[in-house]
Amino acid sequence: MRSGGATTGRRGKWGLPALAGGLTLLAALSAGCAGSEPQLPRLSDLNPFAEKEVPLPGKRIPVALTEGHAGLDVAPADQPIVLPPPQANDAWTQPGGTPYNSSGHVALGSSLRQIWSADAGTGSSSYGKLTASPIVSDGRVYVLDTRGRVTSFSQSGSTVWRVSVTPPSEKDQNGYGGGLAADGGRIFVATGFGWVIALDGQSGKKLWEKNLMSPIRSSPTAADGRVFVVSADGIARALSVSDGSELWTHQGLIEKASLLTNASPAVAGDVVVMPYPSGEVVALRIADGQPAWTESLARTRVASSLGSMTDAARPVVEGGAVFAVGHSGRMVATTVRDGQRLWSLSVPGIQAPAVAGNNVFVVDTGGQLMAITRADGKVAWTTRLPGSTTWSGPVLAGSRLWLTSNKGQLVGADASTGKVDVQLKLSGPSYIAPIVAGGRLYVLTDTARLLAFQ
């Protein structure tokens, strides 16, 4: 496959490139590829879509066959990419946009320019990586830096307030990881110090705090009167949004070494889907924390210690199905209700997919962006993203898929063909997916610069 080209094809088999570098590890490991896995039978019981969908213009080109991972089925070349109409959104209250980690197709202008840049605190250093996604709630943008400081920004980029959530007995450089979620006018902060803290969104005043006694490297999700979070010891918890009291816990498998990723739970009806560093994806009943079903993203065959890393990306719930991908090379779609597997692909990834209409868009660990047919898991097109193999995203906005890279790039790819038709230079590298709210796209760079585009 030619570098930077978008390709599609006839029915057949094709492979993905080998895993590439650029990932921050908690242990020094060597790179490798996962083994092959057959695709499971297709099921067609996904929920129908209420909104009218319009095929996007653009010519699709055949998917080329590449060496590397196991073959994947290819969708018919004459099958159009269809998207639901873009919807205006004024908030991005969770790391995944919504409590179910699916933002759909959001509205965004066709021509972007940077309108402001702001200092959001301390970025990555030798102590730890900046991994927490910004959020937008009630007209404010909120950022958590690597020193345990939360900053609230106005729509013009000015600082409204900044508070430290570092415990008095801790050094602030140990506060990396964690994340933010908003609900009911409150900002919920999960920290690398092991605390979950509720702040008033308007003033930054601390409302309550809860010590989980274990670092939190992933982001929380707030919904249905609860804050859901997974700590580094593999324990999932549900806390009350009113006072932080513990409602239930669930112990997942413990993984001694993992990638420094930042996933978050997905709420879907009466269950919450928890991603664990072990590669487990477990649906727990919101009422009592009892497991409803379990899926594993871990591969049975691996070629190296890096390939054995099983971290799960942020699961996405859309239309009665859960879409999840793991670093070790497995991507699955299952039903929310009972965890029945719809399809499975050999795709390694640590970035949450974007789901809209009958399309699932995902970038793998080698920098290959692809469109997958939601109903049956067939590949519609693939694109080798330019200049880097380490990408964060995608988010679907204004009919484009937006991603950032470790080389300081912001790119937009046409969702109908995969062609990259927008490339912007950032002030620094970014390892966090863009977010979109109020017709603006926000990027947080690795040096903790918050950039706004409109």
Give residue spans per PLM region.
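Blade/loop signatures of beta-propeller domains
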Residues: V54-L72, Q79-I115
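Short loop/turn segments that connect beta-strands within beta-propeller blades
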Residues: S154-S158, D200-S203, S240-G244, I286-G289, ...
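Sec-dependent bacterial lipoprotein signal peptides
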Residues: M1-C33
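WD40 beta-propeller blade core
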Residues: T151, I197, R237, V282, ...
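Structural signature of WD-repeat beta-propellers
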Residues: D145, T191, S231-A232, Y276-P277, ...
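Bacterial Sec signal peptide processing site at the extreme N-terminus
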Residues: L29-P62, T66-G68
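Extracytoplasmic beta-rich repeat domains
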Residues: E37, W116-I135, R162-A181, W208-A223, ...
